[in-house]
Every structure is written in C-alpha cells, then in structure tokens.
C-alpha cells in the first residue's frame, strides 16, 4: 500500500507521486506517516522531509507551511522546497557560513530574528544534502 504525496510551493509542483512512507518536520516535532494514517492537518516547520520510495530514503528541504493528511493522500503546501539532490553543496555551505556570520553581527530584535531564520533555512538545505540518518 502506498501514499500519494504532493509537495507544492506558490510557484511550482515539487513532488507529485506515490511514496511508501514520509517523515515530516512539524512545529511540534517530527511525525512519521505510513499508509492509513489518521487524518490530520498540521503546520510544517523549516526542516527536512524524508521520503521512502522503493526502499530508499530521499530528502527535501521544506521552508515552512502546512500539511493535510487523509485517505492515503498527503498535501504539503510550503513557502519553498528543494530536493536534496538539486541543492549545490558548495553554494549551500557558503550560504550557511554567511548566515552564521550574519547572526553574530545582527543588532536589534528584528535583525536577530531574520538572521536566525536565514540560519535555520541554510542549515536545513545543508542537512538535506547530507542527511544524518
């Protein structure tokens, strides 16, 4: 049995096919979703989406949004998404280093919040290239 996964951004369809299982980063932690999962709607955090397809795990960097799960269909609506295989490792590492430097020199509440969000996005992109597990 499989799940139909759709990952959508405002500009494009990033993924639209059947999968065996996913692990989704939500605002309250990671959740694993298998076929016949209970219906749920949840906020999606900036983080990694892990997709199991043909007994292999693929990764995708998600930049926050919402997900709806029900009837073996998963719809993930996010601000932006990138498949781990599409991310340039060198560019992602440079972006991470720049984001870390910006956090250190940020002044004022707004700059600190924006710098920390940029750092979280940069870390997520690097993690999508080099998954821990």
UniProtKB/Swiss-Prot annotation:
It holds the Pfam family ATP-synt_DE_N. It is found in: Plastid, Chloroplast thylakoid membrane. Produces ATP from ADP in the presence of a proton gradient across the membrane. Gene3D superfamilies: 6.10.140.480, F0F1 ATP synthase delta/epsilon subunit, N-terminal. F-type ATPases have 2 components, CF(1) - the catalytic core - and CF(0) - the membrane proton channel. CF(1) has five subunits: alpha(3), beta(3), gamma(1), delta(1), epsilon(1). CF(0) has three main subunits: a, b and c. This is ATP synthase epsilon chain, chloroplastic. One of its GO terms (cellular component) is proton-transporting ATP synthase complex. Belongs to the ATPase epsilon chain family. It comes from the Eukaryota. One of its GO terms (molecular function) is proton-transporting ATP synthase activity, rotational mechanism. It is a peripheral membrane protein. InterPro entries: ATP_synth_F1_dsu/esu, ATP_synth_F1_dsu/esu_N, ATP_synth_F1_esu_C, ATPsynth_dsu/esu_N. Keywords: ATP synthesis, CF(1), Chloroplast, Hydrogen ion transport, Ion transport, Membrane, Plastid, Thylakoid, Transport.
């Amino acid at each position: 049995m499989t799940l139909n996964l759709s990952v959508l951004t405002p500009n494009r369809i990033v993924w639209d096919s059947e999968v065996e299982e996913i692990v989704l980063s939500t605002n309250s932690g990671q959740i694993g979703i298998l076929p016949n999962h209970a219906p749920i709607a949840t906020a999606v955090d900036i983080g990694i989406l892990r997709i199991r397809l043909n007994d292999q795990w693929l990764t995708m960097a998600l930049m926050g949004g919402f997900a709806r799960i029900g009837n073996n269909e998963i719809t993930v609506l996010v601000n932006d998404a990138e498949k781990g295989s599409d991310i340039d490792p060198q560019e992602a590492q440079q972006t991470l280093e720049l984001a870390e430097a910006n956090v250190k020199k940020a002044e004022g509440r707004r700059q600190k919040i924006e710098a920390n969000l940029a750092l979280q996005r940069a870390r997520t992109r690097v993690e999508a290239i080099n998954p821990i597990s």
